[in-house]
Every structure is written in C-alpha cells, then in structure tokens.
C-alpha cells in the first residue's frame, strides 16, 4: 500500500494520503488494532470497507504508533486530544490532523453523475459560475468543499445548498473560501484544493 504523499496546506495541518494497492494483503490486522478498532473492523461487511478502515489506522500509526481514535457522538477524536478528519473513496484514503478545531477533509472521484445531484448541494449562483469548462471536475471540487466544511462543523441539520456557501473559484484555483451561514451564526473557512488524477480532494479549516 504505497504512500502517495504528505499534503502540507499550512504548518497547523498534517495530512497523509495513501492509495490502497490490491496486490498487498492488508486484510489481516493481526495485533495492529486495539480491541475497539478490531470490533469496528469486524463490523465492516464489505472487503473494500475493511481495507479502507485498516488503511486509515495505518496512516494514523505513521503519525504516532501510540495514537488511537476515540469517538464521541460518532465524531472521531485522537487520544492526545488533537482533532482528526478521515475520508476515503475507493482506493484513496486520507487523514487530516490538527490541534485546532474546525477542520475537515473529503475526497471524491470525478464522475458525471454529479450533474444530476448538483441542485441538492449548490445554490443557483454556484451552479451558474461552475457551469462550462471542466464542469464535472469543478462540481466535484465544490462537493468535496462542502463535505469538508460539513465535517468541520460537526453539527446536524445542515442544508448544503442553503447553509454552506462556496465563493467563486475556477479550474486553476488551489485555494478558496467557504462560509457556513445560519440564523444565529456565521463561520468562515479556508479551502485547499488538490487534484489527484481522477479524484478531487479538499481540506477545510475555520478561520
């Protein structure tokens, strides 16, 4: 399972990314997992989900072999109280770690199917500026941006098309700005965009 690279958006964020290699056997965790993680591993029914879970734990062990992931209301938190966000899509698995709160990461494969659901996560202004050149890639980039912000917010009841807004960006953009807006609060996020062959990855950090 070769390591692709470390992404370094800024000094306060640690991001590691792996591509799962089907030629490598990682389906037998042996003694690599603690008892809680082993139960989670067993609960994963599909083999690809098991592989993704093991890959995420291997990434964490590269940061610190003694780290473990605890969960509070299904939200992951590292045992040293740092914050973590995890994302995976097919053979790509990535983790984002920071001492700061308000972080999120998401990775998705670029797919034309995103066109059929764009009205569910974009407002009309966003749809307009994202139409045209490299539309599938930019729609996917917007989707990962909103997912990353959603993960950073860690709150229920969010409507992507209304509460999470992405300022205009283009195909060449490597950074952007996103906002969460509700009736009683507003939060602003710095976005970091990465193109990974047929995937889009976005990191969000509250500013």
Role assignments for model-derived ranges:
Residues 1-207:
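Core catalytic alpha/beta fold that binds nucleotide/phospho-ligands
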């Amino acid at each position: 399972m070769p390591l692709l690279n470390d992404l370094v958006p800024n000094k306060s964020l640690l991001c590691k990314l792996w591509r799962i290699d089907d030629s490598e056997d990682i389906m037998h965790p042996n003694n690599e997992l603690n008892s809680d993680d082993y139960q989670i591993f067993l609960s994963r029914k599909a083999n690809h989900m098991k592989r993704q879970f093991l890959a995420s734990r291997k990434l964490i062990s590269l940061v610190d072999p003694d780290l473990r992931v605890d969960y509070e209301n299904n939200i992951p938190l590292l045992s040293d109280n740092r914050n973590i966000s995890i994302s995976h899509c097919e053979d790509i698995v990535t983790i984002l770690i920071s001492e700061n709160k308000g972080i999120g990461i998401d990775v998705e494969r670029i797919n034309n199917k995103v066109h059929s659901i764009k009205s569910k996560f974009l407002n009309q202004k966003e749809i307009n500026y994202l139409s045209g050149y490299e539309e599938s890639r930019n729609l996917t980039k917007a989707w990962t941006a909103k997912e990353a912000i959603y993960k950073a917010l860690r709150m229920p009841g969010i409507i992507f098309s209304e509460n999470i807004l992405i300022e205009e960006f283009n195909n060449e953009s490597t950074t952007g700005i996103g906002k969460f807006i509700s009736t009683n609060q507003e939060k602003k996020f710095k976005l970091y965009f990465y193109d990974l062959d047929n995937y889009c990855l976005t990191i969000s950090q509250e500013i």
